[in-house]
């Protein structure tokens, strides 16, 4: 239902945010930003 699709959207958005944070952190550590 609607709640399930909202949950799926939140999970997908959360993954995207986590991945961008991780890539930003790793490039800063490696000084490749």
UniProtKB/Swiss-Prot annotation:
GO cellular component assignments: extracellular region
Cysteine disulfide partners in this protein: 27-33
Family matches, as InterPro entries: Antimicrobial_frog_2
Keyword Disulfide bond: yes
Keywords, sorted A to Z: Amphibian defense peptide, Antibiotic, Antimicrobial, Cytolysis, Disulfide bond, Hemolysis, Secreted
Functional note: Shows antibacterial activity against representative Gram-negative and Gram-positive bacterial species, and a very high hemolytic activity.
Sequence similarity: Belongs to the frog skin active peptide (FSAP) family. Brevinin subfamily.
Name of the protein described by the UniProt record: Brevinin-2
